[in-house]
């Protein structure tokens, strides 16, 4: 397989959301390596698909338990942004690269079904652009699942609730803001949930524009992905932000494992250059996460691993790619690939090795 068609290029950072949108979001929803290694990977990927049970169909268009079973999880649009770069889409026209965390957390004072939301950009966990708290209920009159979107009065207090859910369990309604008219209504149709706001109901006054700004969200949820189309318009119907195509976010799978790097790959001057140094405790998701390889003793090797589900450009076949990158440049040194649903994947280059197993897979 030619690396011309699969090797992940260095990404140009997607255009940031403008300041007007940011204000809206805040107010509304809220030579050491040996030649024998070469550039070829010895693939040790075991294409063992996870035998996941199928969830039964919903009992109604507003089956909340079924909906939440699909909704909860983490999502990322890495392949969408990667493909746009491959296709030569101008950086300003590419979708923003966004990672979404939708974590159910019990908060009885707010509602019976509540979800902590964190969305960050460019694979940088600290680059948070939106943080919300969702509450779901069944609206019998509409025959829909109703999503109320709450902003935090103090976002910093709950910034890491996804890592420490206990901090949010006692949150009170007074610590949140909800914008009337901006609720989303979900209904199950044709094997998917479609979410939308009431037309013209969600708006705010922009002091900069000296007029109202109207928001519309259109969403599609399946068991494997969520598509999000956010748009804003002025009073004359001119679009202020948003794209024709939605952000296509796929649900991630996490993998754990290890790597080992021979010392002379990054420090050839040492007395024992043949020593293999272990990098334990790796954890990364399969939608483009990059993790630097740091040894048990804290030594930076100068290499990283990237795990990503991508599409082979010649045949349009989906693959799970495990790439070895130079940390400083993002250049791909070598990669292996497996079936996109594989439970295990690995690589052996002689001077470095790595093995990853999907969380929850049989050992």
Regions found by a protein language model. Name each.
Residues 110-114:
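A short helix-loop-beta-strand connector motif used in the catalytic cores of GNAT acetyltransferases and
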């Amino acid at each position: 397989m030619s690396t011309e068609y699969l090797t992940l290029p260095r990404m140009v950072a997607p255009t940031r959301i403008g300041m007007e949108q940011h204000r809206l979001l805040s107010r509304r929803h809220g030579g050491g390596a040996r030649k024998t290694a070469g550039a070829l990977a010895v693939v040790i990927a075991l294409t063992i698909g996870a035998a996941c049970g199928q969830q039964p169909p919903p009992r109604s268009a507003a089956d909340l338990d079924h909906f939440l079973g699909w909704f909860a999880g983490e999502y990322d649009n890495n392949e969408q942004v990667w493909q746009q770069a491959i296709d030569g889409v101008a950086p300003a026209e590419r979708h923003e690269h966004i990672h979404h965390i939708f974590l159910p957390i019990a908060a009885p004072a707010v509602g019976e079904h509540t979800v902590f939301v964190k969305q960050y950009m460019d694979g940088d966990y600290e680059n948070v652009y939106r943080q919300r708290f969702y509450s779901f209920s069944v609206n019998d009159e509409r025959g829909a699942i109703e999503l109320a979107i709450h902003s935090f009065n103090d976002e910093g207090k709950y910034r890491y609730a996804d890592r420490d859910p206990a901090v949010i369990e006692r949150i009170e309604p007074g610590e949140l803001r909800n914008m009337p008219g901006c609720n989303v209504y979900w209904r199950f149709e044709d094997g998917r949930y479609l979410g939308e706001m009431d037309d013209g109901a969600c708006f705010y006054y922009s002091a900069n524009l000296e007029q109202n700004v109207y928001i519309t969200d259109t969403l599609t949820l399946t068991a494997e992905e969520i598509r999000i189309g956010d748009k804003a318009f002025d009073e004359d119907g001119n679009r202020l932000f948003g794209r024709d195509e939605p952000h296509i976010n796929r649900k991630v799978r996490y993998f754990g494992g290890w790597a080992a790097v021979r010392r002379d790959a990054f420090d050839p001057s040492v007395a024992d250059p043949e020593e293999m140094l272990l990098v334990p405790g790796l954890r990364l998701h399969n939608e483009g996460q990059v993790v630097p390889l740091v040894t048990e003793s804290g030594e930076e090797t100068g290499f990283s691993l990237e795990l990503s589900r991508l599409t082979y450009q010649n045949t349009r076949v989906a693959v799970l790619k495990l790439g070895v990158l130079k940390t400083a440049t993002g250049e791909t040194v070598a990669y292996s690939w497996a079936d996109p649903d594989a439970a295990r994947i690995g690589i052996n280059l002689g001077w470095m090795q790595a093995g990853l197993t999907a969380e929850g897979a049989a050992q």
